[in-house]
Amino acid sequence: MNDIDTITNAWGRWKTAQYGTTCWFTESTQYGRNKDTRSYMQHQTNVSAPKDLVYSNFVQQDGGSTLLGQYDMINEGSQVIELAVNLQQGLVDTFTWSVTEQLKVGVEVKVKANIPLVGGAEITSTVELSLSSTQGASTSKSSNYGASTKVLISPHSHGWGEVALSFTELRTQWVGNVGLQGYVAIWFNNKVALNNDGDYHYLWFIPVEQVFWECVQHNIVNTSGYVVQGNGVLAQATGTFHSSVGLNLKTIAHERPYPETSEAVRTFYNYASLVPDLETRVRSAE
């Protein structure tokens, strides 16, 4: 991403050449640093930080597991026993935001990034992330995982097993959309009448969206990372989000006749999501 000064200065050289003159300066988001634009702060290009980041769909990878509990029961009766295994465990989830393309709009922009709703417990933390550097941010959150799973013990059987919490490594891309609205100041080294009405001036103020539109239309300078809109421009910081969270319960159940016989042990596996509507919730965070 080119910084905004590089873009407006390239445009300024092109624009003034259309009128047979040269450009002294352009200003966009920092009118206060130039004595010739300090009196026109009302025209400055304003920078609006996003309320949150926009996340893409998540890619999941196995992140290992931890043992939550075990059970061991003998059913001497003639009816199936439904055993409820109640589990609760306090664990630490980690969340990391990396910035791969920072903003270069002349001023620092920060966002209060919410943790996407993808964990196995309610998560309400936010982290302050600068979109103007590649430093990134990370946070840890203690989560109290509680779950109940049901195990069936057949009649005249000995059942035992374990329940584990499977962790999932989640990765996704994010975008921070920063709004630019206002005007780019440009100083022509000879007076010109941009309005073609005989009104000649050195200093003119051009809507920032027109500046970027002309850069794209006339291939003046690379504007990747900026999106022209009807009433302004979006400057887009991008990066990746990574978290390690508990999402699934894995039950390994063993069963053999009771009293014991030579019959082989039967083993069953069962998986239960702690967030059954994970896909819907992830998409809603977009």
Curated annotation (Swiss-Prot):
<dbReference type="Pfam" id="PF03318">
    <property type="entry name" value="ETX_MTX2"/>
</dbReference>
<feature type="propeptide">
    <location>
        <begin position="267"/>
        <end position="286"/>
    </location>
</feature>
<dbReference type="GO" id="GO:0005576">
    <property type="term" value="C:extracellular region"/>
</dbReference>
<protein>
    <recommendedName>
        <fullName>Cytotoxin</fullName>
    </recommendedName>
</protein>
<dbReference type="InterPro" id="IPR004991">
    <property type="entry name" value="Aerolysin-like"/>
</dbReference>
<dbReference type="GO" id="GO:0090729">
    <property type="term" value="F:toxin activity"/>
</dbReference>
<comment type="similarity">
    <text>Belongs to the aerolysin family.</text>
</comment>
<keyword id="KW-0800">Toxin</keyword>
<comment type="function">
    <text>Cytotoxin is thought to form hydrophilic pores in cell membranes.</text>
</comment>
<keyword id="KW-0964">Secreted</keyword>
<keyword id="KW-0843">Virulence</keyword>
